[in-house]
């Protein structure tokens, strides 16, 4: 299996754009990967955008972002107020937000939802990510849930056992408002990372997995529009 280092030069600033429809999506989908990258690279800069929240969940999201991004060289967290569950009907307004984001940031890596996610809010964010950012490395993360939409990802980030435990514990501790959901447990998050670890032959037994639709190796590709 070919090993790729997401951050080419740890001494050069590397900007990550993390996008989540809801307040816990980023942490659930790629929290261990973020912790792993921050342990290895001192020059990570983050733009962290959540598109819907309420007063309680916004406080949880801010605390979670602070916890997960500890050690980042730079971090900017934005928590928005689009109507939960109705993202397809708010397409134009959310698209305007994406266009403003594109003018403000030029990330080296974008982490977003999976395009085949059955949650309509997740799917909208994934579609607008690809619609807006045409010259960037985009990895789509997965969210375990009742809808049974987990697929066969093709990009794996091995995670040591301590980091996997740290991610699972932090998600449950940070988002107390979600603990009444039957699936919102440390065991759920560890189980998915364990399964992806098996599928990628991770030495630790744990990994987070993503969908990588387009990766250009070697010389830079011509920019869209040139």
Which residues does each PLM region occupy?
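A charged, well-structured terminal subsegment
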Residues: 162-188
